[in-house]
Swiss-Prot record:
CDD domains: ATP-synt_Fo_b. InterPro entries: ATP_synth_B-like_membr_sf, ATP_synth_b/b'su_bac/chlpt, ATP_synth_F0_bsu_bac, ATP_synthase_B_chain. This is ATP synthase subunit b. Coiled coil: none annotated. It comes from Paracidovorax citrulli (strain AAC00-1) (Acidovorax citrulli). The gene is atpF.
Length: 156
């Protein structure tokens, strides 16, 4: 292998190429690689922030859901208590009204019983007077008296 001037010229051209590449080609490539690395790092940091924010938001949502469930349960319990109170009040009113109706019916039945007794007394008195008149008009006879008493029984 012979070393001649072309080898030195090729070495110089190679050095010029390396210097040119280091001066003009390598900085934009290095800059692009650095920018890409920075974007990747920023993306990872943003993903971490988003993940932590997501965890915080999920916790807040769970807290709000638990609060809402508790409020809903308490409102439902209040509504059930109110409904039960209204039902009890309606039952009490209905019982009271029923008692009034029963008392009125008993009073009316008692009044009708008294009126019926009065009517019966008047009829019995009239029949007794009528029977006494008939007995006094006729002669005193045990058979006739028994017959009259039997007729009076059937009329009563």
């Amino acid at each position: 292998m012979s070393i001649n001037a072309t080898l030195f010229v090729q070495a110089i051209v190679f050095l010029i190429l390396v210097l040119f590449t280091m001066k003009f080609v390598w900085p934009p490539i290095a800059k692009a690689l650095d920018e890409r690395a920075q974007k990747i790092a920023e993306g990872l940091a943003a993903a971490d922030r988003a993940k932590s924010e997501l965890v915080a938001v999920n916790q807040r949502v769970e807290t709000e859901l638990a609060q809402t469930r508790n409020e809903t349960a308490s409102r439902l319990a209040d509504a059930e208590r109110r409904a039960q109170a209204i039902i009890e009040e309606a039952k009490a009113r209905a019982t009271e009204e029923g008692n009034k109706i029963v008392a009125a019916a008993r009073a009316e039945a008692e009044q009708q019983t008294i009126q019926a007794r009065e009517a019966l007394r008047e009829q019995v008195a009239a029949l007794a007077v009528k029977g006494a008149e008939q007995i006094l008009r006729k002669e005193v006879n045990a058979g006739v008296h028994a017959d009259l008493l039997n007729r009076l029984k059937t009329e009563l």
